[in-house]
Amino acid sequence: GGGHVAQELVPMLVHVGFRCVVMDDREIFANPQVFPQAERIIVGDLEKIGDYVSIGPRDYVCIMTRGHQFDYYVQRQTLACHPFYIGVMGSRNKIRVVADKLLSDGFSLEEIQRCHMPIGTAIGAETPAEIALSIAGELIMERAKRTGKYKKI
């Protein structure tokens, strides 16, 4: 999704070496004026993300849509692609509702628990910029763990 948190997050991630693809089904949120730093911007059907982008085992996916149903569509498709990282933004209730639907679809509890829900590190973030910072921190940490460079200071 291309909402307020994503608008804060993408510049941070690009600045620290991530390549960002933004997808939203609303052109008002998915356009070069909103995301000038994004490598690619996609306006498309969130029920068919595979038609627009290929997700693989080296990818990080941040799911930040505007509602339960869209989170469900995206998380269901993303889990099937087995990326390195999946993070889902939302309240505990929203996350529980989506997780229950995924379980009923046949995804295992282990698969669902691989997802970082809620996305980001627990820093007491409240504003979109603070939430984006907590997400960027989590992604940097996961990248460091993957490359063997993670050390707790």
Positions of predicted regions on the chain:
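Hydrophobic, well-ordered beta-alpha structural blocks that scaffold small-molecule cofactor pockets
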Residues: G2-P57, F70-D71
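Short, glycine/charged-enriched secondary-structure capping and boundary segments
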Residues: L13, F35-Q37, Q75-T78, K101-L103
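Preference for short coil/turn "hinge" residues that link or interrupt alpha-helices
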Residues: V22, I28, E39-I42, K48, ...
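ADP-ribose/adenylate-binding Rossmann-like module
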Residues: M23, Y60, T65, R76-K101
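Internal alpha/beta domain cores that form substrate/cofactor-binding pockets in large enzymes
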Residues: I49-D51, I55-D59, M64-T65, F70, ...
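Adenosine-phosphate binding glycine-rich loop
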Residues: M89-I153
